[in-house]
């Protein structure tokens, strides 16, 4: 029986220069694998706890030595000797060791690092690719990338309220062709921004962070870039938004669009979205309303839920019980999947299975604070999520995921690129 022989954690750096955890697991056959945990900039209030040291003398309080110590002591001592390939049992032990609903004691960064490293080590020991180990024989589908090519909100220091303007290359036969087209649009966009004397500095996720007069201008210039690059707007490449509206809302559920000097209630904001969807080929809006504005979400879902994808990120925080509440209330029709919002691979799997059972789309996602770790690329293929958000075609921590997906596509001898089939349901 393959068992856990040793576990240890190290404080390393993420793509924003902040500390994070690298966890390593060694199995009884001496197979070793590691995983690096990502970290978010805009976070949902119901996310599992990311344990930080709060020692202002180190990394401005953002150190993770306490979380590393938890891995190197409590977690290590309680997991050594357990069967490695029983991921659900080990993850259950991690949850029980912590004893809180949100990993407030050990830290979700500690638990997830170990959970990821264990899955990777087990796959390696069995001489299987990670996507095959996690997904079995049905792991065949390459996801549609949602590439964040203009950054605003908390991901950039500019005047744009919406956090992400994305492109979705739906009209292609393969992942590699979809990615090539996206890269060409990205480079064409840079030239257009240069011509407009706009900044082409990039945000946390590799998208450009120019200053526009309002939140519509980015849609215009991206549309121009798609067509100038030689692609059909809406048919081959569609648009998507992540509004991250929990960052815009006040205690009265009014939404402050500072870039446009507007304050809108939920109904007015939904009307604004409807105008944008009517004018531009927007196929997905993420976090269109605040995580606490469930009444507003119900209205948004009623008004646009049959027309486009409505993704809950801060709304659901990859949590099966919160998703279940949304399902009962007919809120949203898709969920963003971020393993570090929930704490272990097994809990992430539970949420994905629940979503799929109720015909909610799943979008595998990175965080703004990333690393060279490409786990989510394998995870997206393993669970056939159909979509992946992992930044633009810039910054090596984003490219690592795309390169891994290209590698998987090659291993699968093409696999299945879901493309336009993504939204052909219901």
UniProtKB/Swiss-Prot annotation:
Localization terms from the record: Cytoplasm; Secreted; Cell surface
UniProt keyword list: Cytoplasm, Glycolysis, Lyase, Magnesium, Metal-binding, Secreted
SUPFAM superfamilies: Enolase C-terminal domain-like, Enolase N-terminal domain-like
Cofactor info, note text: Binds a second Mg(2+) ion via substrate during catalysis.
Active site: 205 (proton donor), 338 (proton acceptor)
Main enzyme class: lyase
SMART domains per the UniProt record, alphabetical: Enolase_C, Enolase_N
Protein name: Enolase
Protein source organism: Helicobacter acinonychis (strain Sheeba)
Lineage, uppermost ranks: Bacteria, Pseudomonadati, Campylobacterota, Epsilonproteobacteria, Campylobacterales
């Amino acid at each position: 029986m393959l068992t856990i022989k040793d576990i240890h954690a190290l404080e390393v750096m993420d793509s924003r220069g902040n500390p994070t955890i690298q966890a390593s697991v060694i199995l009884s056959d001496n197979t070793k694998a590691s995983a690096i945990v990502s970290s978010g900039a805009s976070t949902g209030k119901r996310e599992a706890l990311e344990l930080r040291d709060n020692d202002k003398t180190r990394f401005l309080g953002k150190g993770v030595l306490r979380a590393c110590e938890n891995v190197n002591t409590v977690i290590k001592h309680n997991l050594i000797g357990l069967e490695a390939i029983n991921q659900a049992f080990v993850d259950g032990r991690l949850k029980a060791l912590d004893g809180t609903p949100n990993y407030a004691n050990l830290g979700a960064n500690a638990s997830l690092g170990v959970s990821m490293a264990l899955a990777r080590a087990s796959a390696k020991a069995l001489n299987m690719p990670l996507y095959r180990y996690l997904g079995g024989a049905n792991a065949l589908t390459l996801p549609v990338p949602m590439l964040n090519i203009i950054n605003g909100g908390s991901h950039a220091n500019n005047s744009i309220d919406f956090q992400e303007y994305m492109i979705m290359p739906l009209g292609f036969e393969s992942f590699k062709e979809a990615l090539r087209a996206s890269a060409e649009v990205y480079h064409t966009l840079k030239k257009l921004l240069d011509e407009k004397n706009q900044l082409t500095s990039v945000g946390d996720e590799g998208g450009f962070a120019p200053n526009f007069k309002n939140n519509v201008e980015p849609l215009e210039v991206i549309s121009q870039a798609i067509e100038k690059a030689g692609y059909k707007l809406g048919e081959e490449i569609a648009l998507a938004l992540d509004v991250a509206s929990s960052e815009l809302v006040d205690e009265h559920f009014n939404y402050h669009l500072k870039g446009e000097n507007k304050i809108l209630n939920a109904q007015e904001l939904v009307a604004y979205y409807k105008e944008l969807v009517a004018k531009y080929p927007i196929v997905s809006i993420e976090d269109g309303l605040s995580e606490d504005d469930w009444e507003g979400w119900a209205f948004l879902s009623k008004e646009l839920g049959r027309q486009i994808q409505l993704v809950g990120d801060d709304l659901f925080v990859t949590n099966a019980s919160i998703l279940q509440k949304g399902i009962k209330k007919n809120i949203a029709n898709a969920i963003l999947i971020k393993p570090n919002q929930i704490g272990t691979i097994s809990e992430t799997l539970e949420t994905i299975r629940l979503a799929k059972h109720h015909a909610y789309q799943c979008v595998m996602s990175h965080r703004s604070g990333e690393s060279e770790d490409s786990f989510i690329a394998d995870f997206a293929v393993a669970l056939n999520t159909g979509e992946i958000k992992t930044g633009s075609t810039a910054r090596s921590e984003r490219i690592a995921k795309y390169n891994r997906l290209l590698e998987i596509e090659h291993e699968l001898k093409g696999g299945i690129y879901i493309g336009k089939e993504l939204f052909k349901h219901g």
